[in-house]
Swiss-Prot record:
It is found in: Cell inner membrane. One of its GO terms (molecular function) is sodium:proton antiporter activity. Keywords: Antiport, Cell inner membrane, Cell membrane, Ion transport, Membrane, Sodium, Sodium transport, Transmembrane, Transmembrane helix, Transport. It comes from the Bacteria. Belongs to the NhaA Na(+)/H(+) (TC 2.A.33) antiporter family. It comes from Brucella suis (strain ATCC 23445 / NCTC 10510). Na(+)/H(+) antiporter that extrudes sodium in exchange for external protons. PANTHER family: NA(+)_H(+) ANTIPORTER NHAA, SODIUM ION/PROTON ANTIPORTER NHAA-RELATED. The chain crosses the membrane at residues 23-43, 58-78, 96-116, 126-146, 155-175, 178-198, 201-221, 224-244, 265-285, 298-318, 334-354, 367-387. This is Na(+)/H(+) antiporter NhaA. Gene3D superfamilies: Na+/H+ antiporter like domain. One of its GO terms (cellular component) is plasma membrane. It catalyses: Na(+)(in) + 2 H(+)(out) = Na(+)(out) + 2 H(+)(in). InterPro entries: Na/H_antiporter_dom_sf (IPR023171), NhaA (IPR004670).
Length: 393
C-alpha cells in the first residue's frame, strides 16, 4: 500500500519539530543563565565591552540583534508560511482556537502594561513587550512532561506561538520603525517584487532567493524599517512546492531551507542572542527597580495577562462553539499551557531593545521579562505535572 508524503508528513514532521524546539529551549535557558553569571562575575566588564566593540559600521550587539536575528525571523517566516498553506493552520477550523487565544494573549498583556504606564509616554513605548511567547522556551518546558501532555496540547501551543510571532512581526514593522528613508524603502520594495516575480515564474533554486534576501536585508536595514522584517518578507517568497504543478513535499525549496536553518537557529542564533541580551549586572542596582511600573508592567503582563488572555479567549471560543477543545486535553491542562504562553524571552527582549534606548530601561525590561517568564515556566510546569498525575483509588 502506497502512502503519499502528504499522509506521512504530519506526525513525523511535528515530532521532529517538537524535539528540536525542546532541545533548543534547554540550550537557550543555559545561554541566558550563563549570561547572568558572567554579567555578575569578574569577567563582567569584558562581557559588556565585547558587546559594544565595533566591527565595521555596527557594534557586536547590533550585528547580533540586526543581522544574526534576521535568520531567526527568516525561519519564523518559513514556519508561518508552511503552517498557513500546508500545516496546522491550513484550514479555518484549525486556525480558530489558536488564533483567538493568540489574540487574547496579545491584547490583555498590552492592556495591563498600558494601565500601569499610561502616564509615562517613554515607558508606554514598551506596550508590546509582554505580548510575545517564546516558542523554544515554552515547548521546552512542555516537553519535560513527555507523554503526560497530550500531543494536541503541543500542537496548540506550537501553532499559537507561531501566530504570536506573526503578530510580533507586524507590531515591529508598524510601531517600531525609525525615520523612513524613501530611496532605500523603494529599493526594498523593488527587491521584494523581484522575489515575488521569481516565485510566480516558478524559480525553485534557492540561491537566487538567498542572494536577493541579503540585498533586501541591506535595503530594509538602511530604510528605517527594522531589518528583521526582511527575513519574514523573504521567507514568504520562498516556494512551498518543488516545481510548478507538483504537490508539496520535502524536496521543496521552503522545506529544504527550513530544515537547513532549524538547528543552527535553535542551537546557535537564538542562544547567542540570549547570551548577548540576558546579561544583567545587579551591581549597584537599586531595589526600587523591581517595583518600577516598567518592570511590573512586563512581569504582570507576561505572568497574568498572558494566562488570563489566552485561557479566557480560548474558553470563550470553545463555549460559544467557534472552536473545539484540543483532543484529550482537560480544562486544567489547557490553563497550564496558557500559563506557559507567558514565557516571553526572545521576542519580548527583542521588542524591549527596540522600545527603549536607555540602559536603565533596558535593564528593567530584561528583569521584567526574565522574572515573568520564569514564573510562567515554573507555575505552568507544576500545574501541568499535577494535572497529569494519575488519581489514586
Amino acid at each position: 500500500m502506497n502512502h503519499s508524503p502528504q499522509s506521512a508528513r504530519p506526525v513525523s514532521i511535528m515530532r521532529r519539530f517538537l524535539d528540536s524546539e525542546a532541545a533548543g529551549g534547554i540550550t537557550l535557558m543555559a545561554a541566558a543563565a550563563l549570561a547572568l553569571i558572567v554579567a555578575n562575575s569578574p569577567f563582567a566588564q569584558t562581557y559588556f565591552d565585547a558587546l559594544h566593540l565595533y566591527i565595521g559600521p555596527l557594534s557586536l550587539a547590533h550585528w547580533i540583534n540586526d543581522a544574526l536575528m534576521a535568520k531567526f525571523f527568516l525561519l519564523v517566516g518559513l514556519e508561518i508560511k508552511r503552517e498557513m498553506l500546508d500545516g496546522q493552520l491550513a484550514s479555518w477550523p484549525n486556525r480558530m482556537l489558536p488564533g483567538i487565544a493568540a489574540a487574547g494573549g496579545v491584547i490583555l498583556p498590552a492592556i495591563i502594561f498600558a494601565v500601569l504606564n499610561h502616564d509615562n509616554p517613554a515607558k508606554l513605548r514598551g506596550w508590546a513587550v509582554p505580548s510575545a511567547t517564546d516558542i523554544a522556551f515554552a515547548l521546552g518546558v512542555l516537553s519535560l512532561l513527555g507523554s503526560r501532555a497530550p500531543s494536541s496540547l503541543k500542537v496548540f501551543l506550537a501553532t499559537l506561538a507561531i501566530l504570536d510571532d506573526l503578530a510580533a512581526v507586524v507590531i515591529i514593522a508598524i510601531f517600531y520603525t525609525a525615520e523612513i528613508s524613501m530611496p532605500y524603502l523603494g529599493a526594498a520594495f523593488i527587491t521584494a517584487a523581484v522575489l515575488f516575480v521569481m516565485n510566480r515564474m516558478g524559480v525553485v533554486k534557492l540561491l537566487p532567493y538567498l542572494i536577493s534576501a541579503v540585498i533586501l536585508w541591506f535595503f530594509v536595514f538602511n530604510s528605517g524599517v527594522h531589518a528583521t522584517v526582511a527575513g519574514v518578507v523573504a521567507a514568504l517568497m520562498i516556494p512551498l512546492k518543488p516545481a510548478p504543478g507538483r504537490p508539496d513535499d520535502m524536496t521543496s525549496p521552503l522545506h529544504k531551507l527550513e530544515h537547513t536553518l532549524a538547528k543552527p537557529v535553535a542551537f546557535i542564533v537564538v542562544p547567542i542572542f540570549g547570551f548577548a541580551n540576558a546579561g544583567i549586572s545587579f551591581k549597584g542596582l537599586e531595589a526600587s527597580v523591581l517595583g518600577d511600573t516598567l518592570t511590573l508592567g512586563i512581569l504582570l503582563g507576561l505572568f497574568l495577562g498572558k494566562q488570563f488572555g489566552v485561557f479566557g479567549a480560548a474558553w470563550l471560543a470553545i463555549k460559544t462553539g467557534l472552536a473545539e477543545k484540543p483532543m484529550g486535553a482537560s480544562w486544567v491542562q489547557l490553563y497550564g499551557v496558557a500559563i506557559l504562553c507567558g514565557i516571553g524571552f526572545t521576542m519580548s527582549i527583542f521588542i524591549g531593545l527596540l522600545s527603549f534606548p536607555s540602559d536603565l530601561m533596558q535593564t528593567e525590561t530584561k528583569i521584567g521579562v526574565l522574572s515573568g517568564s520564569a514564573l510562567s515556566a515554573i507555575c505552568g510546569y507544576l500545574l501541568l505535572r499535577a494535572a497529569a498525575r494519575p488519581k489514586r483509588g
